[in-house]
Swiss-Prot record:
Keywords: Disulfide bond, Glycoprotein, Hydrolase, Protease, Signal, Thiol protease, Vacuole. The gene is REP1. The keyword Disulfide bond applies. This is Cysteine endopeptidase Rep1. The keyword Signal applies. Belongs to the peptidase C1 family. Cysteine endopeptidase that digests in vitro both the acidic and basic subunits of glutelin, the major seed storage protein of rice. Acts as a negative regulator of cell death. Glycans are attached at N228. Induction: Induced by treatment with gibberellin (GA3). Induced during senescence and pathogen-induced cell death. GO terms for cellular component: extracellular space; lysosome; protein storage vacuole. Plants silencinge REP1 develop early senescence at varying levels and show enhanced cell death when inoculated with the bacterial pathogen Xanthomonas oryzae pv oryzae. Expressed in germinating seeds.
Length: 371
């Protein structure tokens, strides 16, 4: 695997991770049992929360959402008070959203529905990492300079695009030695044959779009807007373009196979992120109650082990740096569940890249390139 980018850039990445942890702590709003003693105290906490997170609510909406806020605050308090679960929760910017609203707004890949409809693009045959042996005990592609900063999808169900981009950014850095931030908005606007922008999509389909359209452009050339738009062919054709040769799927329901892939590159995965404990995750190794309704696309960028021997996946999310551990979550590895915790090993895939990147614009967006 070796060095991906120069040492000074790796140091910059480590410094950025430390800065994100500081941002995460500042983003939390503390409360204690006195804030739960009465509805009046909870209402005061609710108003402090709105001011802290800059969440404007008109009077009628505040009253409508207050019930969800109370339930969430009590849930967070009881979880942290019990302790012993290896992870903590905190009152973040999602504080007055009920579970169904949260799932519909921020966990919108609709992966299960799209696969049931037979809309997943076919992968390249085989699993190129099948023969990998003697895996390192820990891998962190952030520290190898293959992961860009945490991004924020906003109120757009574009998690699939962010998951795709993390994996493509990673393999591009590994193959070329250059870390380049790529455009999620191009995928939202232009990859519309089988994906649906802010209404959901599949990472496999996005990989195939990138392959057949001759690459994906940079974030600076085609910046994120958190909304569906018309494909801007002028922006999308701007060079340089990062090229891939397709994608492969990780053998389903095998965390061992997933580890082989992650040891070699960041991997896109679909998970069930609709649980209340996932919504308010703060820090530690997450081992919450979640099913396998795969509704959210994220990327595994490493794995490791705590001092007490708990194994975990390092997962990059797209809900900004104020959520979780600076925008990341450590999820329990080898949990004993079929498909892994929250289904993390059920639908994993990664881009394959051997071809050089383009230094000239594409001919016409959407026209398939000859291979």
């Amino acid at each position: 695997m070796g060095r991906v980018i120069s040492s000074w850039r790796v140091l910059a990445v480590v410094a950025a991770l430390m800065a994100m942890a500081a941002v995460e702590l500042c983003a939390a709003i503390p409360f204690d049992e006195r804030d739960l003693e009465s509805d009046e105290a909870l209402w005061d906490l609710y108003e402090r929360w709105q001011e802290h997170h800059h969440v404007p609510r008109h009077h009628g909406e505040k009253h409508r959402r207050f019930g969800a806020f109370k339930d969430n605050v009590r849930y967070i308090h009881e979880h942290n008070k019990r302790g012993g679960r290896g992870y903590r929760l905190r009152l973040n910017r999602f504080g007055d959203m009920g579970r169904e609203e949260f799932r519909a707004t921020f966990a919108g890949s609709h992966a299960n529905d799209l696969r049931r409809d037979g809309l997943a693009a076919p992968p390249l045959p085989g699993f190129m990492y099948e023969g990998v042996r003697d895996l390192p005990r820990a891998v962190d592609w952030r520290r190898k300079g293959a992961v860009t900063g945490v991004k924020d999808q906003g109120k757009c169900g574009s998690c699939w695009a962010f998951s795709t981009v993390v994996s493509v950014e990673g393999i591009n850095a590994i193959r070329t030695g250059r870390l380049v931030s790529l455009s999620e908005q191009e995928l939202i606007d232009c990859d519309t044959a089988d994906n649906s922008g802010c209404q959901g999509g599949l990472m496999e389909n996005a990989f195939e779009y990138i392959k057949h359209s001759g690459g994906i452009t940079t974030e600076s050339a085609y910046p994120y807007r958190a909304a569906n738009g018309t494909c801007d062919a002028v922006r999308a054709r701007r060079a340089p373009l990062v090229v891939i040769d397709g994608h492969q799927n990780v053998p389903a329901n095998s965390e061992a196979a997933l580890a082989k892939a992650v040891a070699n590159q960041p991997v896109s995965v679909a998970i069930d992120a609709g649980d209340q404990s996932f919504q308010f995750y703060s820090d530690g190794v997450f081992a919450g109650d979640c099913g396998t309704d795969l509704d959210h696309g994220v990327a595994v960028v490493g794995y490791g082990e705590t001092n007490d021997g708990t194994e975990y996946w390092i997962v990059k999310n797209s809900w900004g740096t104020a959520w979780g551990e600076g925008g990341y979550i450590r999820m329990q590895r080898d949990s004993g569940y079929d498909g892994g915790l929250c289904g993390i090993a059920m639908e994993a895939s990664y881009p394959v890249k051997f071809s050089p990147n383009r230094v000239t614009p594409r001919r016409a967006l959407g026209a398939k390139e000859t291979q």
